[in-house]
């Protein structure tokens, strides 16, 4: 059964592309028509491509893989964080810090620093410091959490990255390509879909479209996680039965 349908995509405004003057020629196969100087995305293709992307995400998570959700444009920030948290995956919704993938060890040391500060704060160590110093450290925690809070539990490179707008996340895209991390992304009519392993033709500016696609990604993760839990329960049950026997 398809992940979504044309009606759902239409209601989310996923079919509205950019002005025809701003298009990327590689998107031609995903464009249905032009209307009032705007490209209209072929939603039949979107249904198929979204299905492929969701199946891939499901497969990765089924094998114990992790997904990093990336979307730093204003209209995506809150939605992306919400959906990533809902499925227990990592996210970046503020600025992409250069080197997150290509210099992961250095980034990891910053995360370790953040975690140490949070531990000290939780233990009440800040209460023994001068007020100004304690406030400065609390502000440092808040600052680091803004940029790294969504992936501070990430101990290795993600197995796949989901991107809301590739034209906005060029550094993330380049780092993923360099490190061989597969990309799933929403591609509007101004994007090059060839830069993405699993492109999803869609309006990437409308909040409803972003919400719809992000929620489908999260649903695919949750579905795989639930299937893993069932398998673990069955395996445990079989092992206990064998032991009892």
UniProtKB/Swiss-Prot annotation:
A Gene Ontology term for the protein's cellular component: cytosolic small ribosomal subunit
Keyword Acetylation (UniProt): no
One term of GO molecular function: structural constituent of ribosome
GO BP annotations, alphabetical order: translation
Annotated Gene3D superfamilies: Glucose-6-phosphate isomerase like protein, domain 1 (3.40.50.10490), Helix hairpin bin (1.10.287.610)
Keyword Membrane: no
NCBIfam families per UniProt: rpsB_bact (TIGR01011)
Membership in a protein family: Belongs to the universal ribosomal protein uS2 family.
Protein name: Small ribosomal subunit protein uS2
Organism phylogeny: Bacteria, Bacillati, Chloroflexota, Dehalococcoidia, Dehalococcoidales
């Amino acid at each position: 059964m398809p992940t979504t349908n044309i009606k759902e995509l239409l209601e989310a405004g996923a079919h509205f592309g950019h002005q025809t003057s701003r298009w990327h020629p590689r998107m031609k196969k995903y464009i249905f028509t032009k209307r009032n100087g705007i490209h209209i995305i072929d939603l039949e293709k979107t249904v198929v491509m979204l299905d492929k992307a969701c199946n891939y995400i499901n497969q990765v998570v089924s094998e114990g893989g992790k997904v990093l959700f990336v979307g730093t444009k204003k209209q995506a920030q809150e939605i992306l964080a919400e959906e990533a948290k809902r499925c227990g995956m990592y996210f970046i919704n503020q600025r992409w810090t250069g080197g997150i993938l290509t210099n992961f060890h250095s980034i990891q040391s910053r995360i370790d620093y953040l975690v140490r500060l949070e531990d000290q704060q939780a233990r009440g160590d800040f209460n023994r410091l001068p007020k100004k110093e304690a406030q400065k450290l609390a502000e440092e925690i808040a600052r680091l959490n803004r940029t790294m809070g969504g992936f501070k539990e990430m101990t290795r490179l993600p197995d796949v990255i989901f991107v809301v707008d590739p034209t906005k996340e060029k550094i993330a895209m380049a780092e993923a390509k360099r490190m061989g991390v597969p990309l799933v992304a929403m591609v509007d009519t101004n994007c090059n879909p060839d830069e993405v392993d699993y492109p999803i033709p869609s309006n990437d500016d409308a909040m409803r479209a972003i919400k719809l696609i992000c929620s489908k990604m999260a649903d695919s993760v949750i579905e795989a996680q639930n299937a893993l839990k069932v398998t673990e329960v069955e395996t445990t049950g079989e092992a206990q039965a064998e032991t009892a026997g």
